[in-house]
Design a protein with these regions (language model features):
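Conserved SAM-binding loop of SAM-dependent methyltransferases across substrates and taxa
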Residues: 370-382
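Mobile active-site "lid"/loop adjacent to the S-adenosyl-L-methionine
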Residues: 393, 415, 432-463
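Non-catalytic substrate-recognition/targeting regions of SAM-dependent transferases
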Residues: 235-236, 242-243, 259-332, 339
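C-terminal catalytic and target-recognition region of SAM-dependent MTase-like enzymes
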Residues: 195, 473-536
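Pseudouridine synthase
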Residues: 32-36, 40, 70, 110, ...
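RNA pseudouridine synthases
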Residues: 1-128, 135-138, 179-181, 197, ...
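S-adenosyl-L-methionine
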Residues: 390-436
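Conserved SAM-binding motif I beta-strand of class I
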Residues: 383-388
Length: 536
């Protein structure tokens, strides 16, 4: 796989990225959305030792360097502590600068939810920032800021103290703007091995929307043409969602957007070929009770999509349809989990298979839907059994296999109830290297009654565990918003403990970065990857 677009430089010791605005350097909590550091660290085996040396505020964009080796970490830590690292930022303010060059030296102290610049006599940490006016354009002034020290919010605090708050910095008195106009534009460090200077520069982009910059940073448009473009309130558009599906856009919300808005999206490429058509579907709470035709998206503007059309994700081809009901054939928020199956790499220090299998690894995908997980596991070298209570979706899954040069005849597709077949397979003493559980939020059957993820997930795990080989991996996932991370994890762990087995490796995966998380748009997708010891 190619490097993520955010990577600016990589060598044996260093990884340098251009962080987009609105993305944390690291995750703010164990079950929150990943920061750019977490996302990179767990993405590639070669980045497993990635270390944070310095940080950028969530809303600040620009250059960020990570260490890849112990040698690099020691060298970079020394360089930052001895102030040998050159960092230059560019900021924009709408207040007039009276001087072309000036230096601010003060103590920066915490003051509630922000920081304050006080005289050095007040105590606290000494902070120094050099400022230089780059240009004046109308009411806006562009300045270069060079922090000599590295305190939290230092540039923002010092700019505000000089009467030049950063545009978009509401915390420190800046005028309202679409984003914080602060960018880490230049970085110079010493190469840990050679001692040579490494100097990198990335110009600021204060005009492209932050939502677009985030997707530009993580989506390789050559390998992937289907992803979430707008995630509601997390992207500043409460209650509104937009997906790119190859040549089509799918909008979702409470109310149908006006034709003028949909028409304006035609031709907008977002780094891809032009949009052919724009569809809309209302946000439905009870999809099961709505007829297929009524639940299916409807065209707002442009050209009607073919009944079936292909899209790309991480170089894998999937068939989608906008005429088969509420779901289009692929859950975009599971992209990173499909990549883990494709690459055979779960997270830092966590390979999918504990050791090279003596034969072909076996994977059981329950609630397989159109077999997206199955295709990626098969491309990763596994023999896959896909289990679902829909012949239509299993046939769809077979076509997905064929689209990727895989012969469906070399894999099993089982039609039937998952709960029933888990018992049958256990009686046959079948064992699998990987079990995939991604059940619907609610299901109902005559034999097994109602299943609700928020209360019954543990019982599903208990039913599946006898099929998992010792040191096999369980992928347990749910998009049930009402089931919070802690109770979900608790249910899964309790089932494993009750089965007399033990978790030896664990990774919690949130939704991917194109589904960003905010207070107004909380995380909903939860995934546990667990290597489990003990007999099946």
């Amino acid at each position: 796989m190619t490097l993520p677009p955010c990577v600016v430089h990589e060598d044996d010791d260093l990884l340098v990225v251009n962080k987009p605005p609105g993305w944390n350097t690291h995750a703010p909590g164990p079950h929150a959305g990943e920061g750019i550091y977490d996302w990179l660290k767990h993405r590639e085996p070669k980045w497993a030792q990635l270390a944070i040396i310095h940080r950028l505020d969530k809303d600040t964009s620009g250059l960020l360097v990570f260490g890849k080796t112990t040698r690099a970490n020691r060298s970079l830590t020394r360089q930052f502590m001895e102030r040998e690292v050159l960092k230059r930022y560019i900021l924009v303010t709408d207040r007039p600068a009276q001087r072309d060059e000036f230096t601010v030296v003060s103590s920066i102290v915490r003051a509630g939810d922000h920081y304050a610049s006080l005289p050095l006599t007040a105590g606290g940490e000494r902070a120094e920032t050099r400022f230089r006016v780059l240009r004046r354009a109308g009411e806006r002034t562009w300045l270069e800021a060079e922090p000599v020290t590295g305190r939290t919010h230092q540039i923002r605090v010092h700019a505000a103290a000089e009467g030049l708050p950063v545009l978009g910095d509401a915390l420190y008195g800046g005028s309202a703007a679409a984003r914080l106009h602060l960018h880490a534009a230049e970085l110079e460090v010493e190469q840990p091995e050679s001692g040579d200077a490494l100097r990198l520069a990335v110009p600021p982009d204060f005009s492209t929307p932050a939502a677009r910059q985030l997707r530009d940073a993580v989506i390789d448009r050559v390998a992937t043409d289907t992803f979430r473009c707008v995630q509601g309130a997390a992207d500043g558009q409460p209650g509104r969602y937009r997906d790119r599906l190859g040549g089509w856009l799918l909008l979702a919300g409470e109310n149908t957007p006006p034709l003028t808005e949909a028409s304006a999206l035609l031709g907008s490429g977002e780094g891809l070929p032009a949009v052919h058509g724009v569809y809309f579907k209302p946000l439905l709470r009870q999809v099961r009770k709505v007829p297929v035709a009524a639940a299916s998206p409807h065209l707002l503007a442009g050209v009607v999509a073919p009944e079936r059309f292909p899209v790309r994700e991480n170089g894998v081809t999937f068939e989608l349809s906008l005429t088969e009901g509420y779901s289009v054939g692929l859950f975009l928020d599971q992209r990173d989990n499909r990549r883990r199956l494709l690459r055979g790499h779960v997270a830092a220090g966590f390979p999918l298979y504990a050791e090279a299998p003596s034969g072909v690894p076996e994977v059981l995908n329950c609630f397989a839907y159109t077999c997206g997980f199955s295709v990626c596991a098969a491309l990763g070298g596994a023999r896959v059994t896909s289990l679902d209570l829909s012949r239509k979706y299993l046939d769809w899954g077979r076509r997905n296999f064929e689209l990727n040069g895989l012969n469906p005849a070399g894999h099993d597709f089982i039609y039937g109830e998952v709960f029933d077949w888990l018992k049958r397979l256990a009686k046959k003493a079948r064992l699998y290297d990987v079990l995939i559980l991604d059940p619907p939020t609610f299901s109902r059957s005559r034999e097994h009654g109602d299943f609700r993820s928020e209360t019954d997930y543990g019982s599903l795990v208990s039913l599946a565990l006898p099929l998992l080989r010792p040191d096999g991996v369980l992928l347990a996932s749910t998009n049930t918003a009402r089931l919070l991370p802690e109770p979900f994890i608790g249910q899964v762990h309790a089932a494993i403990l009750n089965a007399g087995r033990r978790v030896v490796q664990e990774h919690y995966g949130p939704q991917p970065p194109d589904f960003p998380v905010a207070r107004e748009e909380p995380a909903y997708l939860k995934t546990l990857w667990l290597r489990i010891s003990g007999a099946g």
